[in-house]
Amino acid sequence: MGEEDTATVDQNSFGGGKDSLLRNRHSSPLPSPTQLSSKVITLPTVLTLGRVAAVPILVATFYVDCWWGRTATTSIFIAAAITDWLDGYIARKMRLGSEFGAFLDPVADKLMVAATLILLCTKPMVAVVLGPVPWLVTVPSIAIIGREITMSAVREWAASQNGKLSEAVAVNSLGKWKTATQMIALTILLASRDSSFERLLPSGIGLLYVSAGLSIWSLVVYMRKIWRVLLKK
């Protein structure tokens, strides 16, 4: 899922605005570039709120059984994936990261991805050889959503402990690959509901299983790191 593996880091690394720097330049030291702004509404946050607002629209269009409904659903998901990257890019380049944005970004990603997975589970995919297979998307969906719930709990617990544990659950490359394959897989699966793209279904299913495998693998890696830290206490 669009997760904290990618999104939180993007929103986590920026200081206050230019005006505050000019006001305080003669009276106090400049803030660290790694300090988060306390502003609630910034451009990246607006984009993130847009992703949250798009979730019910995605659900509504998914059940519109005509070409424009399928097109709208796929387009909404693609737009969400693009803004997931864009809000982090803007936050880095324009130094608009905020505490609220750092909290909201992974929440928006999880909502969009989980909603899409659940929607796909409600309409069984039709495999060329096996016909309708109810569990084809359900199995990797359980793995992906279960992993995200587990990691959210683990990260919250680690944040309340010492710095070593927080470092143990920091972003790794597996999480980034998992997110990339997940977004591509879900885009393909949504698009393949249209007869023009149904030949892409096997590749979408395959990528979803790859994403589920990477999800479990990255969870194991995180748990091993945490275990090593706990053993050193």
From Swiss-Prot:
What are the protein's UniProt keywords?
Answer: Endoplasmic reticulum, Lipid biosynthesis, Lipid metabolism, Membrane, Microsome, Phospholipid biosynthesis, Phospholipid metabolism, Transferase, Transmembrane, Transmembrane helix
Q: How does activity depend on pH?
A: Optimum pH is 8.5.
Cross-referenced Pfam families: CDP-OH_P_transf
Spell out the residue ranges making up region: Disordered.
Answer: 1-23
Superkingdom per UniProt: Eukaryota
Task: Look up the EC number in the record and give it.
Answer: 2.7.8.5
User: What pathway, per the record?
Assistant: Phospholipid metabolism; phosphatidylglycerol biosynthesis; phosphatidylglycerol from CDP-diacylglycerol: step 1/2
The record's InterPro entries line, in alphabetical order, gives: CDP-alcohol_PTase-I, CDP-OH_P_trans, CDP-OH_PTrfase_TM_dom, CDP_ALCOHOL_P_TRANSF_CS, Phosphatidylglycerol_P_synth
Q: Which GO terms describe its biological process?
A: phosphatidylglycerol biosynthetic process; regulation of embryonic development
From the Swiss-Prot or TrEMBL record, state where the protein is found: Microsome membrane; Endoplasmic reticulum membrane
**Membrane topology value:** Multi-pass membrane protein
List required co-factors: Mn(2+)
Q: Which reaction does it catalyse?
A: a CDP-1,2-diacyl-sn-glycerol + sn-glycerol 3-phosphate = a 1,2-diacyl-sn-glycero-3-phospho-(1'-sn-glycero-3'-phosphate) + CMP + H(+)
Q: GO molecular function, one example?
A: manganese ion binding
The membrane spanning regions, by residue number, are: 40-60, 71-91, 100-120, 125-145, 201-221
Summarize what gene deletion causes.
Normal phenotype under normal growth conditions, except slightly decreased sulfoquinovosyldiacylglycerol (SQDG) and phosphatidylglycerol (PG) content, but slightly increased phosphatidylinositol (PI) levels. The pgp1 pgp2 double mutants have delayed embryonic development and produce sterile seeds, their plastids lack thylakoid membranes and their mitochondria show abnormal membrane structures; these phenotypes are associated with deficient phosphatidylglycerol (PG) biosynthesis.
Q: GO CC annotation: what is one?
A: intracellular membrane-bounded organelle
Role summary: Catalyzes the committed step to the synthesis of the acidic phospholipids, including phosphatidylglycerol (PG). Together with PGPS1, required for the proper embryo development by providing PG accurate levels.
Family, according to the entry, reads as follows:
Belongs to the CDP-alcohol phosphatidyltransferase class-I family.
Instruction: Indicate what this protein is called per its UniProt record.
Output: CDP-diacylglycerol--glycerol-3-phosphate 3-phosphatidyltransferase 2
Gene symbol of the encoding locus: PGPS2
